[in-house]
Design a protein with these regions (language model features):
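Acidic, metal/ion-coordinating pockets
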Residues: 30-359
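Secretory targeting and sorting signals
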Residues: 1-33
Length: 359
């Protein structure tokens, strides 16, 4: 399906919506005005968003032999009725070489793909990429700036810089994206007051607001939402449940997350869906695929023009030995079980078909 998406640049602190070729300033959105496969479409009653977790096509110099076809096996799922496809870009698109990891660093990972790889993400169906995470500064401010430019040059919108609200149009409906991570160089989820203000500002610009959070501990032992502050390698990764509930109270229509690199459960709060981690989506030799890390899902959510939940479904994917996503695996049952264990009566009911129902 060809998508009709218009991305706009919204200056933080202003309710005005500006359509600009690009902007780059402290406290300002950097989502450039982008037309994606225009098609005549009157304002509709709903919009469908496909969302995936942590995504990189590889990391220099270990790159896939055929990057343009790396996501071909799951592209039909991304495109299945969705007008917007969102994912977390877990790294940079840059030629910069000055890495955050010094010689002999332990537990330090710096990810970069060539800037031209943005076009492969576009070809796979993506329309909006998040860069609020712990890897956007892997190659410093120069790497971050080149990443944003590369996405825009490929016709992709991005979100996640401090103070940033990214508004796209799909089927005539405005959808605002706001993304957070527990770092001062991102929109910081540890500052609940500032996050609440930003989400409320987004709600004034669009009736449909999607909040993304890069939050929680990492790894195969981090598949449960604890209801408490979570930490990883000494970092405070926030309280995902408290943040998600705050986001909905502030006006979010949908909350999605990744960062733990493993699936987590899903919950309904005040009628709105929260997906606490969509796990990994793609990473040629980047991510471990052992144990529970070899399975994930692609989430489709349909929201009304007023931002209310209408329907949702997860499609299971698994990873080959190189980290390439292919359809299949036990992701449906896995995330359904986790939701029941963690949230009880407020857990999303996930049927064997992947269809998601409110409790």
């Amino acid at each position: 399906m060809r998508k009709t998406v218009r991305a706009c640049c919204a200056i933080a602190g202003s309710a005005a919506l500006l359509v600009l070729p690009a902007c780059w300033a402290a406290g300002a959105s950097t989502a450039g005005a982008v037309e994606v496969s225009p098609r005549a479409a009157p304002a509709a009653s709903s919009v469908t968003i496909a969302a995936v977790g942590d995504t990189m096509l590889g990391t220099t110099p270990d790159l896939p032999p055929n990057p343009g076809s790396y996501l071909d096996a799951v592209r039909p799922i991304l495109d299945r009725g969705a007008q917007i496809v969102f994912g977390n870009l877990e790294g940079t698109l840059t030629t910069a070489t000055a890495s955050k990891c010094g010689a002999g660093s332990a537990n330090c990972f710096a990810f970069r793909d060539p800037p031209g790889y943005a076009r492969y993400l576009k070809q796979a169906g993506f329309t909006v990429l998040n860069d609020a995470n712990n890897h956007i500064l892997d190659f410093g401010a120069a790497g971050q700036a080149q990443t944003v430019r590369s996405l825009h040059a490929a016709g992709l919108a991005q979100t996640g810089l401090p103070g940033e609200i990214t508004v796209v149009r799909a089927r005539g409906i405005k959808v605002a994206f706001v993304a957070f991570a527990p770092y001062p160089y991102d929109a910081n989820l540890l500052n609940l007051s500032a996050a609440r203000t930003l989400i409320k500002r987004a709600r004034r610009q669009a009736r449909v607001v999607v909040v993304y959070m890069h939050a929680g501990a990492e790894g195969s032992g981090a598949d449960h939402v604890t209801g408490r502050e979570e930490h990883y390698l000494g970092e405070d990764r926030g309280n995902p449940e408290a943040f998600a509930h705050m986001a909905i109270d502030a006006g979010a229509s949908l909350v999605i997350a990744s960062g733990p690199h493993v699936l987590r459960g899903m919950q309904f709060y005040k009628g709105h869906l929260i997906a606490y981690s969509l796990g990994n989506f793609a990473g040629y030799h980047n991510f471990s695929t052992s144990g529970d890390l070899d399975t994930s899902v692609i989430l489709h959510v349909t929201l009304s023009a007023a931002g209310r939940f209408k329907s949702a479904r997860v499609y299971p994917i698994r990873f080959t030995g190189t980290g390439r996503p292919v359809p299949g695996g036990g992701g449906i049952a896995f995330t359904a079980r986790l939701g029941t264990e963690d949230f009880g009566s407020s857990a999303a009911r996930i049927l064997a078909s992947g269809v998601i129902k409110a409790p």
